[in-house]
């Protein structure tokens, strides 16, 4: 069964288009290289966002977690963002 991780982020500054482009060009490929099959970054407010990462299964997601922790640390530093929360689980229904 597929496995999803969701992380919620906040920053003191409004994210610029340049920041969003950097995330698209740099961080999404890093997450995929860690094992994700797909990644979406969602702007949830002017100063908040979330990252949804899809994995083939829980084993793949678990194997990626050390690398994901490094990527999250780098994103926090590069964008002066704070990781607010992170959640994960197996997909129980899909359409």
Where are these regions (language model features)?
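Short S/T/G/P-rich N-terminal loop/turn motif that feeds into the first structured element of a domain
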Residues: 1-50, 54-70, 77-95
């Amino acid at each position: 069964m597929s496995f999803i991780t969701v992380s919620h982020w906040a920053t003191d500054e409004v994210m610029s288009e340049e920041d969003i482009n950097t995330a698209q060009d740099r961080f999404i490929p890093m997450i995929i290289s860690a094992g994700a099959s797909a990644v979406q970054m969602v702007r949830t407010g002017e100063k908040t966002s979330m990252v949804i990462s899809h994995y083939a299964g829980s084993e793949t997601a678990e194997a990626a977690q050390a690398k994901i922790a490094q990527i999250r640390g780098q994103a926090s530093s590069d964008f002066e963002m704070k990781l607010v929360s992170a959640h994960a689980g197996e997909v129980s229904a899909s359409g």
